[in-house]
Amino acid sequence: MTDTFQHISVLLHESIDGLAIKPDGIYIDGTFGRGGHSRTILSKLGEHGRLYSIDRDPQAIAEAGKIDDPRFTIIHGPFSGMANYAEQYDLVGKVDGVLLDLGVSSPQLDDAERGFSFMKDGPLDMRMDPTSGIPVSQWLMEADLDDITWVIREFGEDKHARRIAKAIVAHREDETKEPLTRTSQLAKLISEAAPKSFKEKKHPATRAFQAFRIYINSELEEIDTALKGAASILAPEGRLSVISFHSLEDRMVKRFMRKESKGPEVPHGIPLTEAQIKALGSANMKTVGKAIMPTAQEIELNPRSRSSVLRIAEKL
């Protein structure tokens, strides 16, 4: 952990407890971040336990390099590749627990150069892995009005999506204006585009910045693939512990766990034999307890934990 950007792991003990860690078990931390969850898992493992952590952020990989432990392996890549990594390390069906801590880490938000925050001026980037893909600034220069509107509405759930998109396109087409290359420029533009009646407690740019970040990093597709991958590599009684930070993420996690715990749907109105019904398969997982929210004490200590939700499921 650097001296400049500190990170407090959200729902740390609850998410680790949800894994029901065995000292000699095999675990995957799909989101290493700054290592809070990984280090806690390692502290609970015995000599024969193993932890494989994943992250696509080069800064996270550098932080992981500080852990000198033969039980620990760091993998540089997106967590959507979890099933592939498990195959490479011969872990399919042997993993006792998978942890996913979704969203942006505090160091990413606090480092203005990453371009995630509307509170600090920096390059308008927002890529989790700055070495791949295109920055938000480039996408905003190329996307049309309908695409920008759709992204803000779909991933930011912002009712002023069209209004904001029009302001962005108008700015882009005005040759007297500087191109949108800084977070402060975009935040100011969105604030000015917001109706004067705007009364939300959040900054007017909150939802749009979330939307652009989710879109540019394909976050929801990554989560969907990671959840399916985790379910496919867990051992019987293996646990999946997932922390989400906004309604879109939590909705995906909730639906996935519910679907996996119910099994495939039997088509209505089509007579099937018992053998045919069995062939459809059965439930793959079961949910463990109810959704867990941060305590008032944790929120006071770490305000960014306010919107977090932890859900746990177990492989059957």
UniProtKB/Swiss-Prot annotation:
HAMAP family: 16SrRNA_methyltr_H (MF_01007). PANTHER family: 12S RRNA N4-METHYLCYTIDINE METHYLTRANSFERASE, S-ADENOSYL-METHYLTRANSFERASE MRAW. The gene is rsmH. Specifically methylates the N4 position of cytidine in position 1402 (C1402) of 16S rRNA. SUPFAM superfamilies: Putative methyltransferase TM0872, insert domain, S-adenosyl-L-methionine-dependent methyltransferases. Keywords: Cytoplasm, Methyltransferase, rRNA processing, S-adenosyl-L-methionine, Transferase. InterPro entries: RsmH (IPR002903), SAM-dep_MeTrfase_MraW_recog (IPR023397), SAM-dependent_MTases_sf (IPR029063). It comes from the Bacteria. S-adenosyl-L-methionine binds at G35, G36, H37, D55, F79, D101, Q108. It comes from Vibrio vulnificus (strain YJ016). It catalyses: cytidine(1402) in 16S rRNA + S-adenosyl-L-methionine = N(4)-methylcytidine(1402) in 16S rRNA + S-adenosyl-L-homocysteine + H(+). Belongs to the methyltransferase superfamily. RsmH family. Its main location: cytoplasm. GO terms for biological process: rRNA base methylation. Pfam families: Methyltransf_5 (PF01795). It is found in: Cytoplasm. Its EC number is 2.1.1.199. This is Ribosomal RNA small subunit methyltransferase H. One of its GO terms (molecular function) is rRNA (cytosine-N4-)-methyltransferase activity. GO terms for cellular component: cytoplasm.
